[in-house]
């Protein structure tokens, strides 16, 4: 597994946005934090006093002090200690292999000398409990399996340790090394779809599907990882729109929709499929506006009905030239036209009309997939030997970062294709931006149809809020 070591890793998804619903719950229920955690309604700004009094949260997981740190998990329990040599009983730390927004990732070995990955995150973090709760109910061969969870005291901080199987490679590192055959793409995409089908059946939305979060064994067995952004979506609850890595972000998120569905994951896996086909991201936007512009350049201009279906954060019209779709032109080198047809059913502005995961699995492109044929492919052999004769575990990513290290997806990581928190202010595109982006204009209904900006600017989608898209978690 690989993890980007990007300096912008902490400025990824706007995790500090306010959630009014959760604020109300926290004000009224300071003594009932158990209920809030079990219902996935935590707020990132809960004060430390509440956190310190919340020692029996996370579905009755029992924690103990550092002097007696017996821990419990769904699968095993042990005593956790920390010393100057990073050794966490019964796991021996081998080395740090990555660092993400919320924690560090270590390669370790257990008492049976089996390699595992340990993701260490500070306990006070808002997303910790949700990630662990979701991991406990996810049980599928193509989803990352949690082996253990325990707490340690380190540098006067309470750390949550999540233990996973160690899986050495990512789809990002594979795409950096070689072009994939169409049949191997089918097998990988089929496995990814099975993982998505499983989590969507539980109303879980992953919300950050990227090549770096797709792990691969040496045989090509696929595992969906990094559930740090995952959430169980409820129809009567809003969620933050500033989520998901930019290249793989659905258009409804780009216009500030806060009542989205699991169809945002469908868009993401469509981007993954296209990237496997052409060897690079299909929509490599430089910021949120450029991202939307690049999508429009390929798919054509959204209709008025499309805009309404995407539920933008504020009522506005999108005024731009009548851009004809260039979708088939973008994929003209792809010989298998069934996969192009499948992508045309995924890349649809209206989330309701976008293909469901069941429709994707039933599509002719995946009709004859033989999941037991992995041994017939040689794509994974590119990792077998490096120049020094050792197994090559560290590679660069074509889609996410300029520098990567092992175990990307275990940390809630960030990369160059993710925007910073300050980018909620929608700014003017650079001169290198594509034409369709530079012609986007927001028109506020209260402005009597007058453009709120010059033609070479992309103004806020929320003019009444000084350009800031208000998000909820």
UniProtKB/Swiss-Prot annotation:
This is Probable serine/threonine-protein kinase glkA. Its EC number is 2.7.11.26. ATP binds at residues 97-105, 119. GO terms for molecular function: ATP binding; protein kinase activity; protein serine/threonine kinase activity. Residues 1-84, 389-418, 437-473 are annotated as: Disordered. It comes from Dictyostelium discoideum. It holds the Pfam family Pkinase. It is an enzyme of class 2 (transferase). The keyword Transferase applies. One of its GO terms (biological process) is positive regulation of gene expression. The keyword ATP-binding applies. It catalyses: L-seryl-[tau protein] + ATP = O-phospho-L-seryl-[tau protein] + ADP + H(+); L-threonyl-[tau protein] + ATP = O-phospho-L-threonyl-[tau protein] + ADP + H(+). Residues 91-366 form the Protein kinase domain. Residues 7-84, 442-466 have a biased composition (Low complexity). GO terms for cellular component: cell leading edge; cytoplasm; nucleus. The active site is at 208 (proton acceptor). Keywords: ATP-binding, Kinase, Nucleotide-binding, Serine/threonine-protein kinase, Transferase. Belongs to the protein kinase superfamily. CMGC Ser/Thr protein kinase family. GSK-3 subfamily. InterPro entries: GSK-3, Kinase-like_dom_sf, Prot_kinase_dom, Protein_kinase_ATP_BS, STKc_GSK3, Tyr_kinase_AS.
